[in-house]
Amino acid sequence: MDDKKFSIVFTGDVAFDKYMDGRWEDEKLLSGEIYDFLHSADHVVINLEGALYQPSDLVKTDYFHAMNPEAVCALRRMKADIWSIGNNHSMDAGKEGLVSTKTIAKANRCKTFGAGRSEAEASQPVFLGEQAGGIGMICVGYQKECAAATAHTAGCLAWDNDKLIAGRIKEIKKTCRWCIVIAHGGEEFSPLPLPYTRERYIGYLKMGADVVVGHHPHVPENYETFEDGKMIFYSLGNFIFDTDYQRAHFYTDIGVLLKLNFTKDHLTFEAMGIKILRDNGSISTCAVPDIFTDILANEYQLLAPLAAKAFLAEDKRKMIYLNPSKYGGKPEALKDYFSGCSHEDYVKGSHMDFDIIVPLAQAAINNEWQNSKLSKVKQHILTLLRGEI
C-alpha cells in the first residue's frame, strides 16, 4: 500500500437556499484562498443540508431546506466529490428529494452517505481505496429530527443505532487503517458539546473509529485529541449557510475548513477559518475561531457549566425569535420552557435534555470555569452571555 500523504477536506454546513439562494452562479462565491485549500486535497467532503430538489408545491418554512439542482455547479467548482447527507434536512423534501439528490450525485461522479432508501443503504460506508492504508467513512444523525431509516423506509443512519454503527466500523477496520465517523448532532449554537454528546462521540472512538467530525450546531466548537492519536472535531460550524433564524445568534457567520492528512502510520490536520460576508453573500478567509482549540478532559470539566449556561442563553434567543408573542419579555414562559422536557426535540439523556443541562448551567455560579487556562475560549463563551451574568 502507498504510504504517501493522503488528504481530505471537510467543510461545515452547506445549503444553497434562503440568503444563499442563487449564489451558486457566482464563480467568486468563495475567495481564491478557500478554493486553493479545497483543491489541495484528494477529496472534499461537504455536509449538504437539504435535497437538490425543488418542486413548486413544497411547503417551505424557516426550518425547511431544499436547493435548486443547478447549485451542483458550485459543488463542482469546489471539487466536492463526497456529500454527507445524514442530517436533519436531507428528508425535508421526502423520499423524492433524497432520490433526486443521490441521482444528481451519481451523474456528477460524486458519492453520498449517511442517508438512503433503506437502513442498509444509509449505513453503507464510503471507501477511499488503499491510500494511507485505506480509509472508510460512515455518517450518523441524531434523534429525533434526522429521520431514521428502517429496513424498508428511507432516512438516515440513527446515531444511537449502536449495534449497526459498531458493525459498520468493524467492517471498515477489517480492510482499512482509518475509520472516520461523520456525526450530525449536538445542540444548536452551543459553544461546547454537552456532556452526553461528548460521551457519545467518545463512544464511537471506543468502537474503533479513529476520527469523529461533527456538524449541526451551526457554530464552530472545540476539538479534542487523545493519547492514542484519535481525534474528535465537535463542530465545524457553517460554510455556505445563511438564514434569518441563524442571524439571531452569535458566531453563525464563521466556521472552519478541516483538512485531515493521513499516512499509513500518522494522522495530522490543518484548519482554515472562514467567514460569511453577509453584506454581499460571499465567503472569505478569517482567523481560525478561538473556540476551535484542543480542550482536554480537565479543561472541559471546568468550562462545561459556563458553556451550558451560554447554550441556554442562545436557546432563549431562539425561542424568542421563533415565537416572540409567547416568549418575548415573558420570563415566566421561558422558565416553564426550560423546566420541562415536553418539547418536540427532547430525547432523554441525548438531546435537549434540560433535566441535565439546567443543573449543569447552574453550577457555573461556583466560578470554577475561572480556573481554566484557556482565556480566549472563556472570552468566546462569555460573549454569548452578554446581559446574562
Where are the model-predicted features located?
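N-terminal catalytic scaffold of extracellular/periplasmic and nuclease hydrolases
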Residues: 1-86, 92-94, 101
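Active-site neighborhood of phospho(di)ester-bond hydrolases with catalytic His/Asp-centered motifs
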Residues: 10-12, 44-49, 78-88, 111-116, ...
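Active-site environment of divalent metal-dependent phosphoester hydrolases
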Residues: 17-19, 52-55, 88-102, 119-124, ...
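Binuclear metal-dependent hydrolase catalytic cores centered on His/Asp/Glu-rich metal-binding motifs
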Residues: 19-32, 65-66, 129-179, 199, ...
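Short acidic, glycine-rich surface-loop motifs adjacent to enzyme active sites
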Residues: 41-52, 169-192
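Active-site-proximal segments of metal-dependent phosphoesterases and phosphodiesterases across multiple
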Residues: 55-76, 178-210
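Conserved beta-sheet core of the metallophosphoesterase superfamily
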Residues: 79-82, 195-256
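A short C-terminal boundary segment appended to hydrolase-like catalytic domains
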Residues: 249-251, 255-389
